Amino acid sequence: MCIRDSHNTSRLHLCRTQFYGRVLWDACINGSSELMTNLSMSLVNILYNFQLLRLAGENGVAAYGVIMYAAFLFVAVFVGYAVGSAPIVSFHYGACNQAEVHNLYQKSLRLIAVVAVSMTAASMVIIPYVARIFVGYDAQLLALTSRAFRLYALSFLIMGFNVYASSFFTALGDGVTSALISFLRTLVFQLAALLLLPALWGIDGVWLAVTAAELAALAVSVYMFVTKDQKFHYRHG
């Protein structure tokens, strides 16, 4: 029912709306990957701090804090591109423009590969300078942070593909696949790596946990890219 005045000639009117529960549910499912990412961060950070306190004391926690601040600058590049390109993918998929979806998919993977290598190389160069800004007052802590950052930065080679995979399936309306990638990547694989790797390599295992988790998640992302192509047809246009 529309509420309109007899003298109102506008095409826009106030109307009594309906509650579309199915649409709301689908939107929640499609955005569940972002929910899982944010929920898992707290749990993973708690375990990181626990392991670092056990293996390296307060210096380990301080080094981790520096790494998180610096790493966010690199991770933001991947997240920004994935989130920014998602509406374009959604638009062309909704318009049944499979050729353009294929084009976006192929070019995005190539771009992410180039950026991943470039950022990893850049991070290796700037690590000493970034660490010195935060912990230059302590030579031992500076050495620990620099080494930790170098090990952690290896994850930049892989991370972008997983971030993009999760966002890409969200853009296609496949929230379940997107959430699965995000859940495994940010919680399950990281928790497993944080529990297993320190037992093998000590504190280096803590710094390598994120790379191991991203590598395992990459296998899942590749599997989903291959199998879901039968439904969405983005690999061959």
Language model features with spans:
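Short runs within selected transmembrane alpha-helices of multi-pass transporters and secretion channels
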Residues: V79-A82, Y152-A171, T177-L187, A193, ...
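Hydrophobic alpha-helical transmembrane segments in multi-pass membrane proteins
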Residues: E34-I46, F50, V79, L111-M124, ...
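Alpha-helical transmembrane segments of multipass membrane proteins
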Residues: I46-Q51, L73, A121, Y164-F168, ...
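Short alpha-helical transmembrane segments in multi-pass integral membrane proteins
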Residues: R4-S32, V89-S155, L196-G237
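Helix-terminus/linker motif at the lipid-water interface of multi-pass membrane proteins
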Residues: L39-Y69, L73, F91, C96, ...
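Small-residue-rich hydrophobic transmembrane alpha-helices
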Residues: A63-I127, M159-I181
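Hydrophobic faces of transmembrane alpha-helices in multi-pass small-molecule transporters and flippases
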Residues: R16-L47, L52, L73, V77, ...
